[in-house]
Amino acid sequence: MFDVIVIGGGHAGVEASAAAARMGKKTLLLTTLIEQIGAASCNPAIGGLAKGHLVKELDAMGGFMGEITDEAGIQFRILNESKGVAVQGSRVQIDMDKYRIIARNKLLKLPNLEISQEQVSALIVENDKVKGVKTNLENIYFAKKVILTTGTFLNGLIHVGENKLQAGRVGELASVNLGNYLQTLGLKMGRLKTGTCPRVDATSIDFSVLEIQDGDVNPKAFSFRSRNFNPTQLPCYIARTNTTTHEIIKNNFYRAPLFTGQIEGVGPRYCPSIEDKINRFSDKESHHLFIEPQTIDATEYYINGFSTSLPYEVQTQMLHSVKGFENAKITRFGYAIEYDYIEPTELKHTLELKKIKNLYCAGQINGTTGYEEAAVQGFMAGINASLSIDMKEPLILRRDEAYIGVLIDDLVVKGTKEPYRMFTSRAEFRLLLREENAILRLGKYGYVLGLLSEQDFAYIQNIANNLQKGLEFLLSKEFTPNNQNNAFLESLGEDKISSIVNFQKIVARASFDIEKLKKLDPMFETMDNYSLREILNEAKYCHYISMQKAQVEKMKNLSELKIPENFDFKSVSGLSNEVVEKLNHHKPPTIFAASQISGITPAALDILQIYIKMQKKKA
């Protein structure tokens, strides 16, 4: 008898099984190929805009992805560095082979975790409660909780031109029996599609005609726990399609599964295939292609931006039309893959299914796309399954606390009909949810759960103390416009002042940096750069942060007004049939959750608030 069984060893499965095992739960990870644990099935990179935030938040609570990325990273960049800190994002090219090996080895060393190479064929469900699983080897395993992290494997169907192949990804069997079994549970399910790009032999690429894209000169680690960080970095390259490429693709639209009706699933809006781009943006004469090394030895390159399901011979033809790729040899062809998913409105915020008790879902099965989105869901599912076993309150992150909270709330409340990708624009309070303050926001949860060490938490507390001391100093001290103070400002390269201002106003200037902050007071010279960056950020955005915190308080009031689990919305007079239907479908746990549902009007919310408050008074 296991406490937790995790089905699938992708990024969600890695984090789910690790979290449960590290929280003291006897855990079993079942996966089709042990060698493929933690595999990056598509692009060789972790992070990016908003995705980097997710990894930082995961790391802040003790997840594995950030640490593994730092160990396997071969190029480190901060995206949007010229823009505000709220929308900057860390992105790391990884050695895909090394990443996989590190992930597998970290799991194999966990004392409470067993791993078995088996494919689950069915669940054992009694009275709407999951009790265990059955596998293709006819083994039966019982567990208190089961977490589905099946990725693209549920009835996975690969498309290349007119050809179709049942598979979870190339070279691995689709999970047909489990996919069919889930259809019998009365869950709302759908079909989604994603795709991948060709990989090319490095010796066949003419790099001399490509634009080089180097990593940052002073790379920053993803994980605050990474020690002795000094990575070897490789360049990426940029190529461009041209009108000849586009003509080849257009001439073969009739062979594209995307357009022939062969593919039924909905693809990712923000990561379209090259044929979809040519069709949708027919006026563009060129599209960027990012040429990314797959490993540190750089023998193969991933052609990012060239995702396709066109026939093999067409892929070769269109790639040869790109400058620098005239003699390119494709080592692995691109393809599209369709798979089953469960509509995420079927889930609670804990990621447990509403209809099947003790059954949790994480990753692409919930309608998301991306390694990072999958990893954080797996982590939260593993945590909440473990907390439930211990009869403890679940960990549900609010929208103002974390991008993880935004992601899960969007899925559970709004649902999705297309692969969901995280963006900074999805977060209402993104100035509060910066990458670098993730440890200050979420470290306490990781520590309480036993996923962060005493040493790690002490480091976080030290930064928090430095931040508090630094801000108190800046807000309490004043600059008067005398000759001595103005001379000091001029020595820093700053403009003089003509009226009394506090230090925070000086530090808030765009030109004020860490080196200048150190000269402001000896206290700052003793602080580490992490603390100093946070003091600068808080000082520069002080006014806007205060505004967002006021908005958060309003949201909290709505979030604290809970709607009873089996609430009868029909009993509320004044609500239209449409509103009642939507509320019954989504079953929002709070008034705030109800406010996020499309079509729920402010008037309906007012009526609902008044009714629930009256019922609470009567009780």
Swiss-Prot record:
GO biological process: tRNA methylation; tRNA wobble uridine modification
Location in the cell: Cytoplasm
Pfam families from the UniProt entry: GIDA, GIDA_C_1st, SAM_GIDA_C
Binding site for FAD: G8, G9, G10, H11, A12, G13, V120, S175, Q364
Any one of the GO CC terms: cytosol
Residues where NAD(+) binds: 267-281
SMART domains: GIDA_assoc_3
Primary location group: cytoplasm
Keywords per UniProt: Cytoplasm, FAD, Flavoprotein, NAD, tRNA processing
Domain of life: Bacteria
Family membership noted in the UniProt record: Belongs to the MnmG family.
Role noted for this protein: NAD-binding protein involved in the addition of a carboxymethylaminomethyl (cmnm) group at the wobble position (U34) of certain tRNAs, forming tRNA-cmnm(5)s(2)U34.
Record text on subunit structure and interactions: Homodimer. Heterotetramer of two MnmE and two MnmG subunits.
Record HAMAP family: MnmG_GidA
Name recorded for this polypeptide: tRNA uridine 5-carboxymethylaminomethyl modification enzyme MnmG
Organism name: Campylobacter jejuni subsp. doylei (strain ATCC BAA-1458 / RM4099 / 269.97)
High-level lineage: Bacteria, Pseudomonadati, Campylobacterota, Epsilonproteobacteria, Campylobacterales
Name of the coding gene: mnmG
